[in-house]
Amino acid sequence: MARVASTALPLELRAVVAGLTSADVADDQQWILSLMRKHGLAVITLLWRMLGSEQDVLDAYQTAICRLTARGCNGMGANPSGYFYRAVSNAGIEILRARQRHRACWPAVVEVQRRHSEDRSQPMGLDQREMIDKMRQAICQLPTHLRNVIVLRELAELPYSQVARILGIRNGTARLYRREAILRLAEMVGREANP
């Protein structure tokens, strides 16, 4: 069960209640505003005692108001005040249950994340580093026009249209340069692998 909070409302919650006096709404929404003005302080105090957290109080209050507004004045039955209190209480109880579920499930979530992080691939091995170094050297050996296209297209992952615009060439030319660069890189890396 939640701890019993102090009955003194924090400033932010008092500001919510005080703001109800100056609120201006359409005529068809006056019913909800009158409920909020009449019972606002009491339900916010109820939520404060129930939840003990300003943010949770505001969330529950907003949830209840949104649900009541969506339901409409006619959907509240013969006792709108009682319905208002019940809606606010239900919103508060939902937050308490969500906290309970969070506390119950959080250790399992942490364990899954820990296992997932252990399953991730280990840092690059020596072979991978050597291969990356060879690829970098091969890219540096390419002619400038091919190197520019391969860097922009493959490393920066830009679309051909943007690569072409940056380099001042046509899309088809960018595609052709990329193809040529890949063929040359494959040849260079293959030559180094099979001397």
Regions found by a protein language model. Give the residues of each.
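A short, charge-rich alpha-helical start-of-domain segment used by transcription regulators
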Residues: G19-T45, Q55
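Acidic, proline/glycine-rich intrinsically disordered inter-domain spacer in sigma factors
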Residues: T21-S22, Q30, E111-C140
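Sigma70-family region 2
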Residues: V25, G52, Q62-P80, A98-Q100
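Short helix-capping/turn signature of helix-turn-helix
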Residues: H39-G40, R49-M50, V151-L158
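Short, small-hydrophobic-rich alpha-helical interface motif
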Residues: V43, L47, V57-L68, F84-A87, ...
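Arg/Lys-rich amphipathic alpha helix in sigma70-family domain 2
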Residues: R86-A108, Q128
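DNA-recognition helix of helix-turn-helix
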Residues: S89, S161, L167-A193
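Helix-turn-helix DNA-binding module
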Residues: C140, T144, N148, A156-T173
